[in-house]
Amino acid sequence: MKQQISEMRDILDNPSEEDDDELESPDQSNSGVPSDHHQGFIFGYSSTMVSMRSLHPSPSQIFILWEVFKENVDPLVRVLHRPTAKNILINASSNTDSLSRSAEALLFSIYYGAVASLTPEQCQSLLGESKDSLSKRYRFATEQALARAGFLNSSSLMLLQAFVFFLICVRHQDDTRLVWSLGGLAIHLAQALGIHRDGTNFDLNPFETEMRRRLWWHISILDTRSSEDHGTDPTFSEQFYDTKLPMNINDDDIYPDMKEPPKERVGCTEMTFCLMRFELSVVMRRLNFTAPGDDDPDANKRTLEEKEKLIDQCHRVLEEKYLQFCDMNIPYGFPFFSQLLS
């Protein structure tokens, strides 16, 4: 407790090293590379001297990045509906000026995530540029696109998807408190859109209900992992949401205009890996964290045997719902499930 109080005092009382420096515009850099400062977009700063069109990849690179995204990122982070995102990407390859601001932010976050998943050698081979240069460009472009779209005051689900996906990617490249801090902002933005309540409460169509569920549960994972990164308790509490888990389905099972929910699949699907992560995250929170004001008198008194029982129960659920159907020789098998332990 003393250590936590000391850390919080440091956050509040000690200005960061950047406080005395002016926020550098990307255009002021001698190298032409975007600045390493990333706070401006949070407050809506958008450089009027930067052409967003110039930050987009070429049409051929757009499809290379899309293939990388499908192969490396989408199986592990299922915030998006792949067919819908592909349609946006096809439009962008022919005319970026036709993109809505929300769609542009989403595309830049996809480019950034794709580059983040590549090695430096792969970036040079596939895209003809260094990973460092591409990462800085698409991170800056995503930040600019979010600011220009007014993400803090927007009611666009797509824009929130772009923001959350961006934070998930940044967390693996930035060890500052940025993602931990902005994760709380993502939760509040999601609550403002009512995403903490299941879509069936509002008679939303099955597609929108499903996409809201995916987004909410990825925010949950982000909150848990970023809290672990900085030794704090997660913000999430099961008492303040009723959003159900996403369905165990493939993207081809849903589409925007559908009227009836799809039949949930039995076995391994495109959503299975993420569903297992979501189920595990709930158990981990119950095992490791208890809200200071929790009214449940037993919450703080779980014995070792009770915790072991909770773990065994989780193992049975995962085995019965998912693992028994998974072929470890196919893409959605062992390579992905092994990451549950990382």
Kindly label every feature range from the protein language model.
Residues P120-E121:
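Cytochrome P450 core scaffold surrounding the K-helix E-X-X-R motif
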Residues Y241-I254:
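Flexible glycine/proline-rich, aromatic-decorated loop/lid segments
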Residues Y255-K263:
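The feature captures the short pre-catalytic strand/loop hairpin that immediately precedes
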Residues T48-I64, P75, I88-Y112, A116, ...:
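Extended, leucine-rich alpha-helical cores of fungal transcription factors
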Residues L76-H81:
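Alpha-helical solenoid scaffolds in large eukaryotic transport, assembly, and signaling factors
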Residues E7, I11-E18, T290, K321-Q324, ...:
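Surface-exposed polar/charged interaction patches
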Residues M1-D74, T96-D97, R101-L106, Y111, ...:
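Intrinsic, low-complexity transcriptional activation domains
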